[in-house]
Amino acid sequence: MTLKRFSLFARNIHLPKKTNAASVESNGSLAPTDEELEVINSLPPFQHALQLSSQSATKAKRSYLETKLPKVQKLFKSSRDPAYLAYDFPQGLSNPYVDAHARPVTNPVTGDTKYRGTPRLSVTKLLTKRWCELRETYDIYSRIPIFEHSQVKQGRKEHQRLEEEVHAPPANIEEFEANFEVDIPDDPFHSLVEDWYLSIVRLVTLFQKGQAREILCHGYLSSRTSGFVRGKVKDDNDVLVSGIIDHLILRQRRAKNNVPSSLTQVLSESVDINLAQFLNLLPSLVQQASKDFEIVVSDVKTRSTKTIPRQQTVVKASKMQVMYYRFLLEDLGRDAETTYQKLLINAQRRGFNVDQPINPAKIINLLEIDPMIRGDMERLQRGDQLGFKPFDSEAELNTSQPVYTLEEFDEKITDLRTRQKYETLFTTWNTPVTLRYFAARLALMYENVGPLLSQNLMIEYYCGDVNFHNISFSFDAEELERQSFDSAQFWFGKRAIEPIKPNMKNLQTYCKYCDYESVCLWRKEGRQACKTLGQELVRLYNGNSPNAITRE
């Protein structure tokens, strides 16, 4: 268990019927040939770049750069200075989302669209100016994952530690999964099932214990308007944007600290949660608590030293990231029926059939992780309604589903403990368990989060296991709208690349940490301009000085 400038719709992007198909071969438009790689590698700046990297980088990083730099050089080779990388989009490839990220291919006969890339964006992908947008562009078009250095690996461990402090895995879950007598699927479809279920469980923990970690959120960005979609998703050209929220804190509004607080004492003392009963009770509790409690959205940043980043673009991007999370969570919390639809489209955009029955072994596995949906499973077994209209209506209409049965478990499972807990479920069910069920329950959980969302946001900085500094700030809807529009304009090829301002401070601060430092034409021209400006200022100063006049 683990825990240019063409509009997008002009490229005939549709809801994918198939995704990431191995049978689709790349046309090679972005991939250099062996001969091209040899020529590129022989260019003096590239030899210099690789020599520099060999002095300070690890063997893994050197290998990484030797693969990435030639690919970028092939696409961005400057016509004015061929040894350097240009700072505009490659000719005919000016839509980063279509040309480098999603890379759709439409079958001219069937009209089916397949993707050689990823037909969605993440919140972090929207932060194109967190460092330098030109560097981001080169990385996007290289189609090579960002190098994972030791600090990133350490940060992931720290996130996992924080997650398990709040959401400790059941003590015997690994043993159960290893010894269960039926194979438990762990393919992408069933991984999504588990992810949605864990988000449900963790949001219950939020109201019970006052905090939750690693919560899914998502929304849709219009490739036509470059704005986020409000309400139902109606356009196949609306691009899925997903994120994972590091930390949600339920606290008293007038509190001077971030101490988590249960919504009510009754919830904090509850041990065995029945999800259906919990959801029936929760709306009234949220309404009563809305004046006194708030949910703060926070992001965790790990650092190798007890310092915060000096670069203002980095801090600003971190704030924007949390604002995105808060915005998406608020949107999901407006109306459960609309959110239900958005969740189903989310799954479809990933290539999944929302009516595909979930493997019964996975259901038993989820019940072992947390049994709060046991009552719901028994309702589906009997064919009873859940009490959520969109789901119940679809269940009544969908009569062509295959038989959903756990009868074979009666023969396969001999473990007495497992049989004692679950054998009443080993029958044929009237309603199959599909992604629709988890979408319905997760949508209702989001709806109860929305009313409590705070305008106060936070970034938590950790060094090791020490939370050494927090930055508190306010949600700014107008700024978020400006930034998201600007980012969408970039991703959908509706504006030019906007590198860092080429002043000496930026060129020294940002460029020295960049993989493209020695082959970047923007940096080269910026340094030349700064040098020329300095010489001109000296000339002007000397020309206007009294001593200069006397000499003349």
Swiss-Prot record:
<keyword id="KW-0269">Exonuclease</keyword>
<keyword id="KW-0809">Transit peptide</keyword>
<comment type="function">
    <text>Single strand DNA specific 5'exonuclease involved in mitochondrial DNA replication and recombination. Releases dinucleotides as main products of catalysis. Has the capacity to slide across 5'double-stranded DNA or 5'RNA sequences and resumes cutting two nucleotides downstream of the double-stranded-to-single-stranded junction or RNA-to-DNA junction, respectively.</text>
</comment>
<feature type="binding site">
    <location>
        <position position="132"/>
    </location>
    <ligand>
        <name>[4Fe-4S] cluster</name>
    </ligand>
</feature>
<dbReference type="GO" id="GO:0046872">
    <property type="term" value="F:metal ion binding"/>
</dbReference>
<keyword id="KW-0411">Iron-sulfur</keyword>
<dbReference type="InterPro" id="IPR019190">
    <property type="entry name" value="EXOV"/>
</dbReference>
<keyword id="KW-0496">Mitochondrion</keyword>
<keyword id="KW-0540">Nuclease</keyword>
<dbReference type="Pfam" id="PF09810">
    <property type="entry name" value="Exo5"/>
</dbReference>
<dbReference type="GO" id="GO:0005739">
    <property type="term" value="C:mitochondrion"/>
</dbReference>
<dbReference type="GO" id="GO:0045145">
    <property type="term" value="F:single-stranded DNA 5'-3' DNA exonuclease activity"/>
</dbReference>
<feature type="binding site">
    <location>
        <position position="511"/>
    </location>
    <ligand>
        <name>[4Fe-4S] cluster</name>
    </ligand>
</feature>
<dbReference type="GO" id="GO:0051539">
    <property type="term" value="F:4 iron, 4 sulfur cluster binding"/>
</dbReference>
<keyword id="KW-0004">4Fe-4S</keyword>
<dbReference type="GO" id="GO:0036297">
    <property type="term" value="P:interstrand cross-link repair"/>
</dbReference>
<comment type="similarity">
    <text>Belongs to the EXO5 family.</text>
</comment>
<feature type="binding site">
    <location>
        <position position="520"/>
    </location>
    <ligand>
        <name>[4Fe-4S] cluster</name>
    </ligand>
</feature>
<dbReference type="GO" id="GO:0003677">
    <property type="term" value="F:DNA binding"/>
</dbReference>
<dbReference type="GO" id="GO:0005634">
    <property type="term" value="C:nucleus"/>
</dbReference>
<keyword id="KW-0460">Magnesium</keyword>
<comment type="subunit">
    <text>Monomer.</text>
</comment>
<keyword id="KW-0238">DNA-binding</keyword>
<keyword id="KW-0479">Metal-binding</keyword>
<keyword id="KW-0408">Iron</keyword>
<keyword id="KW-0378">Hydrolase</keyword>
<protein>
    <recommendedName>
        <fullName>Exonuclease V, mitochondrial</fullName>
        <ecNumber>3.1.-.-</ecNumber>
    </recommendedName>
</protein>
<feature type="binding site">
    <location>
        <position position="514"/>
    </location>
    <ligand>
        <name>[4Fe-4S] cluster</name>
    </ligand>
</feature>
